[in-house]
């Protein structure tokens, strides 16, 4: 009786048949169609990482692990003798001194790290103020101005808080005569910050990471006095106070003080030679309103820690920060602390360093 082939024999026969067919196929490899399957990429639907928290106050460079998220607050402050001593100048992070009509000066005082209760006397805005304040994307408080000047503030991305428009925070101080009697409460000004102003300002200058490492301190020459003549009628002096570790301000030769009698001082004094031109606009007395040309370039000096160094300044646009460059072509590092900036008109103003 013949036996039926088993499964193993059947499988061997099938394999042999397949090999035989392959041998008859012309000897070339058999093309096997392929299909590309695109990879599936899962989108990261999580929130973007939060920016790193600041480790220093942006307008002073002073280290801190608790930098407030409030915006920068700039306030126009008067500097006539009737306005002195002004409230709040001693608490400002940065103060700009500018020449206005008649050769008098006014301040743009900028607050962020400190919150003085009261500031003033407050006065009106001027054509150069947008270029000073715009890089901080903050608030500018002032009493009023001609319409084109106010429009320029808004066009620069700055929020205006204006007494003449009924905004909160302004009051008239008893015992002072107009127009030297308008003061303001910083808490009320900050409370009106709009939804675009919920972050601290960007740094306006570069600061040394530790004390004594500023550019003037490490590479400058000793300085005892900066004598700044802004006009025929306005003169500021800054003398180095070794005991105080700061430059001390005088109006002319008279010490400048706060309402409490404390001397006004600065860790850094920046003196810049700037172009000043007359606008087509006039003040109520008929004098042309001047404008300091903030966009451009020029020379100057930076003084820190009893030393001074020559610098070049440049500013590319209204909303661009002012850049200070040292003799080596590198960016100037300021010492940590308050900075005062003197805008000295070329030709009509001057300064000496001794």
Question: Residue locations for each model-derived region?
Answer:
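A surface/extracellular/periplasmic glyco- and lipid-processing/surface-interacting theme
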Residues: 35, 53-92, 101-110, 115-354
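Post-signal peptide N-terminal segment of mature Sec-exported envelope proteins
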Residues: 33-52
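C-terminal motif of bacterial Sec signal peptides marking the signal peptidase cleavage site
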Residues: 20-23
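Bacterial signal peptide processing site
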Residues: 25-28
